[in-house]
Amino acid sequence: MSENLVASRKRIDYIDLLRVVAIFSVISFHFLYSAIARGRTPNVSFSPFSEWAKYGYLGVELFFMISGFVMVQSARDLTFRQFITKRFFRLYPSYWLALLLIFTIASFGFWKKPGPSAQELYFNLTMFPTAFGQSWLDAAHWFLARQLQFYVAISIVLLLRSGKHLGAIFTWWAVIGCAWYFLGIQTFHIWYLNGFFALITGGAIIGLIREFGFSRFRLIALTASYLWALDSRVSKVNWLNQNRGPGHSALIIGLVITAIYLLMILTLVARIASWPIRGAAFAGTLSYPLYLVHDRMGGLVIAQFGTEGNKYYLYLLVVMMAIAFASVLLKVERIIMSPFTTRSRSAKTL
């Protein structure tokens, strides 16, 4: 393997920085906009920041792009068994610990919102509770079902011993998905041609360009993924206005999606890709448990104790609390899983 190829597969601090941007975008959306709009925190009203926080949900789109970027480089040389093992240890231990923590805290009797049932907990342990007609223990966890869909697709490719073709698969995936979308065939609701996969394939193609260079077809595919992602996200504006509250701007959504693509394309700049950022690796790793624990527990605290007078202090306190819980979860997970994950820990990416 050439030195350039080895260098392109090293962990990139800039990507971890983007993970931090993504997670705090999502947190701002949940606390400053979504919880208020849905009446989960009735004693707290919108703030001047809410108009911008309402677009923080697009941090999930950035996470999807990062997933594609990382996957095309990390999975190609793995066997089916290696991939399943790494993904299992990446997702499930932290998820189970987070569920137990959320269940325990949410079950305390003094919260305004009733705690979850044991049945909800059991089905959530699968990471796809809606398949059994159950709701998510934490509504923010819906993202994980899409991740599992993605991993199932990759595992099938590896099971067929076609990992070396992942680059071509992602490239064609973007082109076919774009055509499928704009021809209106998406009404068949095929999972893997959902708009979220526009972002996954876009991230993967950027990873391919970084590793192997530009080609005409990769540029066409990247453009296709961008157009697919842009229109599929912007077209949700009416749904957003009806279900999350009025005032969503198609222009702002489009600008954010464009910014996400540009931020990912910056990984092609050698100086940025090699930029050492102190603490970035830890912060990037922490983004996953932080995503898992922040929403329901933070919402409970704000609903119970939040007022117009203390809301900004409480937001800061809740974020600090979530970071502390996430740090503890990460340490506990490493202690429990260290006998099993010594070889795979370096592969921790989202």
Model-based region annotation:
Residues 138-142, 185-192:
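Surface-exposed cleft-lining segments at the edges of enzyme active sites
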Residues 61, 68, 88, 125, ...:
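Generic structural signal for small/hydrophobic residues in well-ordered secondary structure
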Residues 11, 21-27, 92-108, 270-274, ...:
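Hydrophobic alpha-helical membrane-insertion segments
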Residues 16, 20-23, 60, 67, ...:
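Residues within membrane-spanning alpha-helices of integral membrane proteins
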